[in-house]
Amino acid sequence: MPNWTYNRIRVRSDDSEKIKEIKAIFERKDPFNALIPEPDWTTIPLTEETLHRYSFSEPRGKVGECSMMVKNENPFLAGLRFPSTNKSDDRWYEWRCDNWGTKWEACEIEITQDDEDFLEITFNTAWSPPEPVAEILRSKYECNNVEDYHKGLYLSINWFYELEGEEGCGYLE
């Protein structure tokens, strides 16, 4: 069970098409994957380097083996598994943390303000804000910094979280 991070993205632009594009990304169930696509783990064989990662005893599969999607009513037995060992393929976890900044997709996405020149989106992420996703948004849409917020496209990202007995926040400009 993660600690949740509440994220807010605000976009201001005189280009309504860019506003619509960003809105469309966050109307999907997988906005992070839309911006930074996750590999298809069923097509990527295990390597010597990834064979024992996160495993303290037996390897998760065989070198060169690809995982398969297993369906099961029990959620602990469903998902990507290696046929030779029936162990879970958890390579997604490190990849997502490295490439999205968090282990899961955005959840509880809400478009809280939607005008022709302003968009505000809120969502939650597990443990931490999706900083790499924010950087891709800024780069893809050529966002201005805070001093130039009234020209072109300006995007601000804020996040808030609570840990036992303390609160934290941050922002990217």
Question: Which residues make up each language-model segment?
Answer:
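Long, contiguous binding/interaction regions
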Residues: 1-173
